[in-house]
């Protein structure tokens, strides 16, 4: 019995020792405060002499793994590490101390000429708040064998006001422009070549991981918006009374908006990366088509109140929807064709739309070429819509006055009120859509200013919410819900295909306008 007890105790002790050896090699020491000291001199008492620093045995351990920045473990050859950063301040390098960084890649040993150009000093902020200028190799321990923080990195040039930073004695790093504090697993330093006029210099520069904004909020809003777009289209297809010319144009607009936002969502999730350029072209086509259909709606509203009794106008009225389709889809194809042609022919990057470049399956919106191919047409169409809505408002006021001089005033007044409601709802649509896209243009113009970029983030969320806003405006209003209930009960299935025109010579009463 005693033998069995001793055996169990021995087993427990062995397991504890194995676990401690594997998972707690150096007690109370962060892996990112250690360096590989396998090549250092080992003393009889188990201590190591590393770069003139005595590392006691209690601060050493044998590792057969390395910890990656995401806290996962990667199997490596067994080696000895020392918690030297507890004994002397460390500086976290991306590569060996005599290598130079070039486009995020570590290059081999620097030449003698490069070594003479190197500025080896760093400004280190001490615990008492004072700043000390220290030689990176003679006064600090260089940690160069830690895993790279990430694949994509950018460097900071502290000669620029927006690239200022503070390096602390304990290894933490403070980035000034967004006031973010980084640990040693999130940044690294390395020698980098800088242009100084006609000459070059080599200095130690911090490299940070590319800032990838969280897409959770955008994803939730865009998915909700897309669902609302589908519901809006479904209601307009289901309720026959909504399928007059206004309704048909509105359905086309919603389909274009849905497809454009779907490709934006694919780009956000990087689903379209395998067919990036075609996805960017299709997304551009549908967004431009959405703007053109919005201009069709504003033009049709103006034409509705303008009215005409000419034979040519009546002939056009019978084929108006076909004409609108030809204009909207045709102009979208023309704009897309010009963009694709420029993308393949224009060599100057300042004039090339650069579809599918810089990691985004869309037109490159960080350059001024976007104003020519994307925001320019957008500004023109917004200006056109504003003009049409102003002219329509003036016509409504004029018709309202003229009605007083004709017989059947009550019928004409009802017709005018119905069309006014249609105008009001589409005016709201344009104000919201036009405002959101106008803010988007403002965001594009001020993108180099971080403060204004944060302000215009509101515009982004407003843009992503367009489907939700349209659903509330057009579906959740009382008259549409009433028509939906009637359609579900099988009532009011007739569609009035007559044109919704206000003409002083020939006015027809139409109950089926969207109201």
From Swiss-Prot:
Q: What does the UniProt entry say about where the protein is found?
A: Cell membrane
Please name the GO terms of the biological process aspect recorded for this protein, alphabetically: cell surface receptor signaling pathway; determination of adult lifespan; response to starvation
Protein name per its UniProtKB record: G-protein coupled receptor Mth
List each coiled-coil range: none
Q: What does this protein do?
A: Involved in biological aging and stress response. Essential for adult survival.
Which organism's genome codes for this protein?
Drosophila simulans (Fruit fly)
The UniProt gene name for this protein comes to mth
PANTHER family, per this entry?
A: G-PROTEIN COUPLED RECEPTOR MTH-RELATED (PTHR47154:SF2)
The stretches that face the Cytoplasmic side, renumbered to this chain, are: 240-248, 300-320, 392-424, 476-515
Q: Where is the signal peptide?
A: 1-24
- UniProt entry tagged with the keyword Transcription: no
Keywords, A to Z, come to: Cell membrane, Disulfide bond, G-protein coupled receptor, Glycoprotein, Membrane, Receptor, Signal, Transducer, Transmembrane, Transmembrane helix
Complexes and interactors: Homodimer.
Q: Recall the GO molecular function terms of this protein's record.
A: G protein-coupled peptide receptor activity
Can you tell me which residues are glycosylated? 45, 109, 123, 170, 198, 449
Q: Does this UniProt record's set of keywords contain Membrane?
A: yes
Cystine pairs annotated here are 29-83, 85-90, 94-188, 95-106, 150-209
Q: Name one GO cellular component term.
A: plasma membrane
Q: What is its main location?
A: membrane
Q: In the UniProt annotation, what is the result of changing residue 345 to L? A: In strain: GA2.1S
Under the heading InterPro entries, the entry gives: GPCR_2-like_7TM, GPCR_2_secretin-like, Methusela_ecto_dom_1, Methusela_ecto_dom_2, Methuselah_N_dom, Methuselah_N_sf, Mth_GPCR
Which residues lie toward the Extracellular compartment?
25-218, 270-278, 342-370, 446-454
């Amino acid at each position: 019995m005693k033998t069995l007890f001793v055996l169990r105790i021995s087993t427990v002790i062995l397991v504890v020792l194995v676990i401690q050896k594997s998972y707690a090699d150096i007690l109370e020491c962060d892996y990112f405060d250690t360096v590989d000291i396998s090549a250092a001199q080992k003393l009889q008492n188990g201590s190591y002499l590393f770069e003139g620093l005595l590392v006691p045995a209690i601060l050493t351990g044998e590792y057969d793994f390395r910890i990656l920045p995401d806290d996962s473990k990667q199997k490596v050859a067994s080696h000895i590490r020392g918690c030297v950063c507890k004994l002397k301040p460390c500086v976290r390098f991306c590569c060996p101390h005599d290598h130079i960084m070039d486009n995020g890649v570590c290059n081999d040993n620097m030449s003698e000429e490069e070594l003479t150009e190197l500025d080896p000093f760093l400004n280190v902020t001490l615990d008492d708040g004072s700043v000390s200028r220290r030689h990176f190799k003679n006064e600090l321990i260089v940690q160069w064998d830690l895993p790279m923080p990430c694949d994509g990195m950018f460097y900071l040039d502290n000669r620029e006001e927006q690239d200022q930073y503070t390096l602390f004695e304990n290894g933490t790093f403070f980035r000034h422009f967004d006031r973010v504090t980084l640990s040693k697993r999130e940044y690294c330093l390395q020698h980098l070549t800088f242009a100084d006029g006609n000459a070059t210099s080599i200095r130690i520069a911090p490299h940070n991981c590319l800032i990838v904004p969280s897409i959770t909020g955008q994803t939730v809003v865009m998915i909700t918006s897309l669902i609302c777009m589908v519901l809006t289209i479904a209601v307009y297809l289901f309720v026959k009374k909504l399928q007059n010319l206004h309704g048909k144009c509105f359905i086309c607009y919603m389909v274009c908006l849905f497809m454009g936002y779907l490709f934006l969502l694919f780009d956000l999730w990087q689903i379209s990366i395998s067919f990036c350029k075609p996805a960017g072209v299709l997304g551009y086509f549908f967004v431009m088509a959405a703007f053109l259909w919005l201009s069709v709606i504003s033009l049709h509203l103006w034409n509705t109140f303008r009215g005409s009794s000419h034979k040519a106008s009546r002939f056009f009225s019978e084929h108006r929807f076909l004409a609108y389709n030809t204009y909207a889809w045709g102009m979208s194809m023309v704009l897309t064709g010009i963009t694709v042609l420029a993308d393949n022919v224009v060599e100057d990057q300042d004039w090339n739309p650069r579809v599918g470049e810089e990691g985004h399956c869309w037109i490159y919106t960080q350059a001024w070429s976007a104003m020519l191919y994307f925001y320019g047409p957008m500004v023109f169409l917004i200006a056109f819509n504003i003009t049409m809505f102003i002219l329509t408002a003036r016509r409504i006021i004029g018709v309202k006055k003229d009605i007083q001089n004709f017989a059947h005033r009550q019928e004409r007044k009802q017709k005018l009120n119905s069309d006014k409601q249609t105008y009001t709802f589409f005016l709201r649509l344009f104000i919201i859509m036009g405002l959101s896209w106008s803010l988007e243009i403002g965001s594009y113009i001020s993108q180099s200013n971080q403060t204004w970029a944060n302000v215009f983030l509101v515009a982004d969320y407003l843009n992503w919410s367009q489907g939700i806003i349209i659903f509330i405006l057009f579906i959740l209003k009382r008259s549409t819900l009433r028509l939906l209930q009637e359609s579900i009960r099988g009532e009011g299935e007739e569609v009035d295909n007559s044109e919704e025109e206000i003409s002083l010579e020939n006015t027809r009463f139409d109950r089926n306008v969207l109201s």
